[in-house]
Amino acid sequence: MSLVETDWLDQNLNDVKIIDCSWHMPQTKRVGFEEYKKVHIPNAIFFDLDKNSKKNTSLPHMLVEKADWEEIVSKMGIKNDDKIIIYDNSDVISSCRCWFNFIYFGHNSEMVHVLNGGLKKWIKEKRKITCLLYTSPSPRDTR
């Protein structure tokens, strides 16, 4: 897994797809999407780990089928040749799970990275944040 530093992302905000994949254990009473709506890195797209996992299983967060994955990333406006930076604001390292999903489904491992330190480090360094929700462009071909 490749990490990128906050300095690098700050200089390349408009050249990459940024994904907030914050997920919290249920007992914490924290909800990743609710936190995303209040604060996130500019241009970040929220990836809902619960919503984007297989539904017809008793096990949590199982991978969806390839066709379902392609629909998910297409709706997010992501193509196979996009450089992707994934981060989270959680203690369970959900960004790594999201990274795994992209690699498992064939996205080039040199194009998918995790932000070192996540949102906590980004905010601690007083970098630009927003509450504006990302609006996905029309779905694209993800193949």
Regions found by a protein language model. Give the residues of each.
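Single conserved hydrophobic/aromatic residue that forms the stacking wall/gate
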Residues: Y134-R143
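Conserved active-site segments centered on acidic
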Residues: E125-I129
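Catalytic cysteine-centered active loop of the rhodanese-like fold, especially the PTP/DSP P-loop
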Residues: H61-N116
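Long, charge-dense
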Residues: G118-W122
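Structural signal for conserved beta-strand scaffold positions within catalytic alpha/beta enzyme cores
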Residues: D20, F46-D48, I86, V114, ...
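Positively charged, proline/Ser/Thr-rich regional signature most characteristic
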Residues: S2-D81
